[in-house]
Amino acid sequence: MPSGEERRDRQKGRRAGCDTSSTPSNTAPRIPEPGAHPTAARPATAQPPRSLLPPVCSKTIALPASAAAASGSDTAGMRGLGKAPHSGEGHERGRGNSKMKACNNYQYGYLAKPDTSFWIKCRRWLLADAGRHTQRPFWTFRVSHSPLLEAEAGRPSDVSQLQLGSDLKPKMRRPAGELFSPKDAGWELDPAEKSE
């Protein structure tokens, strides 16, 4: 049995962190198993627990994807959503070892709230632009291409060109001011009108 002095020395050693007893602990060297390689045993200077390690700087050491997903990333388990990979422009600097910060670069931040008013404005602009081209006043073609009005204004219309507004194609051209009769256009009067 160990004496009282040995017991005191052992307690002092435990407090100082150098436990030499055969009790299993994280820092004590392990005895190699029979048949194992002699260098496979753990070295006597084992690493301190994780809490004693210096804090990892997020600027210099990049966490792997699995660690980023486990650390509460907003894209964990969601493929195709979240922020696209980019160089980190627009991120905040400083504040040491903090958790994943929000990306201030809205060029890549797809999870940001979409500005729906912008798309509503775009839709209105597109609809107005389309209406400007399609909703044309119905009289524009008829007035400009009507042979009757052109004959009255002294501008005889070219019969060889397609008449968009009317099917009236006069065979004879008359100077402005003269009456335009249906006979000149090649129309035949109704028999009732002939009898009158």
Curated annotation (Swiss-Prot):
Domain of life: Eukaryota
Region feature Disordered, mapped onto this chain: 1-55, 70-99, 153-196
Amino acid composition bias (Low complexity), ranges on this chain: 34-50
Basic and acidic residues biased stretches: 86-95
Regions of compositional bias (Polar residues) in chain numbering: 19-28
Protein name (Swiss-Prot/TrEMBL): Putative uncharacterized protein MGC39545
